[in-house]
Structures are given as structure tokens and as C-alpha cells.
Amino acid sequence: FAFTNQNGKKVTNKDYEGKIYVADFFFTTCQTICPKMTDNMVWLQDKIKDNPKVKLLSHSVFPDEDTVEVLKKYAKEKGVIDEKWNLVTGNQNDIYKIARQSYLVVKTGKPEEMYDMVHTENFVLVDQKGRIRGFYNGLNIDKNVKDEKNLTQLLEDIEFLSEKD
């Protein structure tokens, strides 16, 4: 992948090679699940900020509206640490393709719906080798819900992966 972050810097998969990272999909004007997800990603950023093995990656699903300037303002408002967390924008079809094919974050639908909006509450944990290790409900820090992993479990899994290396 190759996208542009909140600072206008090109971000590629090379920037995440050998890193544990958490990916999600959002847009800055979302009024439903995104504000809570972003707050929870800020919570996660605070927990992992001293771990050099871990990064965060948020993809805008409305890249035409979420320009570099918009992402920069949003990042500043939310307290994003630039070295830890990239908010990226780019070609919408590329973002939706990576969401579906690389992160598997949406249910498969009809081919004509391929580029409909990707809107999911999932945080995706990717290990140092680029393998998906789990999907976690980005709206749930610590509630126990059947068949669902919460963000406390995500943090435990990040710590486990950090110790393995």
C-alpha cells in the first residue's frame, strides 16, 4: 500500500514492516461509531506509546473529504502522536480494496457493491510478519460480549506479540 498521512508524508507497507500494528477505517465527519473508535484508539495509543514495536494506522474511507489538511487538524484535536499513529488518505478504490482484500474488514457482497462505503467498528491486529492476528471491537474497551474481542484483549495480545520477538 501507499497512502499519504496527516503530515503529507507518503506511508507505505515498508513503514510497517517488522512492526505490530492496529489498523482501522474511519472518516473525520462521522457522527456514529467513529468518534468513540477514535477515542478508543487514543486510549490504545496512550497504552502503547512507549513500545517501539507497535504502531497504529487509520484509513479514511472518505479520502476526497479527508484531505491532508483535514487529517492534520483532526490529528491535532485528538492528540495523535505522529511517530506512533498515521491517519492516511489516498485513492478511495485503493483504500476500499485493501480493507476488503488485506484486512478482510467487511462482509463480502455483490461485485457492484465492491466500492460502497467500508464502515466497520473493527480494529485489526497485524503482527510483525504482516499476518492478521485478530479482530477487536473498537467500541468496546472492557465489556465481555460473546464471540467478540474487546480492546483490553487487544492490548494483552499486543503485549504477547511484543514479548515473542
Locations of the language-model features?
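Short active-site neighborhood of thiol/selenol oxidoreductases, capturing the structured segment around
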Residues: 11-41, 56-57
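Thiol-/selenol-based redox modules, centered on thioredoxin-like
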Residues: 111-165
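Soluble periplasmic/extracytoplasmic beta-strand elements of cell-envelope proteins
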Residues: 21-24, 57-60, 122-125, 135
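Structural microenvironment flanking redox-active thiols in thiol-disulfide oxidoreductases
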Residues: 38-98
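Sec/Tat-exported extracytoplasmic proteins
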Residues: 20, 45-49, 78, 99-102, ...
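N-terminal signal-anchor transmembrane helix
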Residues: 1-12
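Structural micro-motif
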Residues: 85, 96, 102-108, 118-124
